[in-house]
Amino acid sequence: MKQTTMISAKNINKKWYIVDAENKTVGRLATQVALVLRGKHKVDFTPHINNGDHVIVINAEKAIFSGKKESNKFYYHHSMHPGGLKKRSVSVQRELDPTKILERAIRLMLPKNVQGSNQYRALHVFKGSEHPYAAQKPEVLEISTKKGDVK
């Protein structure tokens, strides 16, 4: 009778992937990147072990939103002081720091615990096509652009 194999933290080989966000919808890109960060694309996925891979996202400023979200979607945060609610539209955020748009979308799709924060550290988002991780020899990760189109 076969036993279920359980992986351990010392047996994990993390790969590096690179994703080009140019003309990709933010939500579809974020869900597929979050799956790779969690390791759910692997056959030996184990919920209590962080066996996700590193993901480099380039051209973050060229990611798109569908519909009128560029002007109608807002990011909120509060300073915890009376009257301290701040809001910023996507277009304003894109001018200030476009990498934060993708970072926030992906972070909110990861677990809200210690393991989720460790998986979030494996995300590297860059404005433009230059990145300092060429030595890791990242593989290109194809992101599907249509609903139901899984590659």
From Swiss-Prot:
Organism field: Mycoplasma capricolum subsp. capricolum (strain California kid / ATCC 27343 / NCTC 10154)
Role summary: This protein is one of the early assembly proteins of the 50S ribosomal subunit, although it is not seen to bind rRNA by itself. It is important during the early stages of 50S assembly.
Alphabetized UniProt keyword annotations: Ribonucleoprotein, Ribosomal protein
Gene field: rplM
Superkingdom of the source species: Bacteria
InterPro entries named in the record: Ribosomal_uL13, Ribosomal_uL13_bac-type, Ribosomal_uL13_sf
Assembly with partners or alone: Part of the 50S ribosomal subunit.
Similarity annotation: Belongs to the universal ribosomal protein uL13 family.
Gene3D superfamilies: Ribosomal protein L13
Lineage: Bacteria, Bacillati, Mycoplasmatota, Mollicutes, Mycoplasmataceae
GO MF entry, a single one: structural constituent of ribosome
GO cellular component, one term: cytosolic large ribosomal subunit
Keyword Secreted appears in the UniProt entry: no
A Gene Ontology biological process term: translation
Protein name: Large ribosomal subunit protein uL13
Pfam families: Ribosomal_L13
